Regions:
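A short, conserved, highly charged catalytic patch centered on acidic carboxylates
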Residues: 1-118, 125-144
Length: 144
């Protein structure tokens, strides 16, 4: 499988295996094998970034958590918590997906439920960050 090089400063160790023509990646947090899709490749980079680089406990990293939004169930990609409080909401897209205002609006809707202090939109190549304070988003440059 040809995986794109993503825009992360660190290089991580990956456990990847093939089975019946499909590729799977081991998810450290959920302790399971997941089909390796382009979006999952990005999500796993963020998981490794927060766990191995930022030294967050795996228990503070919630992946594909269900939330209720306007009577429908949605799944967020990654929520970083601190003492069970939402801190950073990460919305992952496949590398070929552009980060558009629609992607931001989707993430902001999810955050209307969660109230995380920061959101990150990422396709693995580009990262957009916004702080959420007093009901408003303030975009800022991504800093490693």
């Amino acid at each position: 499988m040809d995986l794109p090089q993503l825009n992360f400063n660190e290089t991580y160790h990956w456990e990847i295996r093939a089975d019946k023509g499909k590729f799977f990646i081991h998810d450290t947090a959920r302790r399971t094998w997941l089909q390796l899709t382009p979006e999952e490749w990005v999500r796993q980079h963020w998981l490794h970034y927060f766990h191995f680089t930022k030294k967050r406990n795996l228990s503070a990293l919630l992946l594909e958590k269900k939330i209720e939004l306007n009577g429908t169930t949605k799944r967020i990609d990654l929520l970083v918590t601190e003492k069970t409080q939402p801190k950073i909401l990460v919305e992952c897209k496949a590398p070929h997906i552009k980060l558009t205002p629609t992607v931001f609006e989707q993430t902001a809707r999810y955050n209307s439920v969660l109230q995380a202090e920061e959101i990150i939109l990422s396709n693995g190549l580009q990262h957009i960050v916004a702080d959420f304070t007093d009901g408003k988003y303030l975009f800022r440059p991504w800093e490693w």
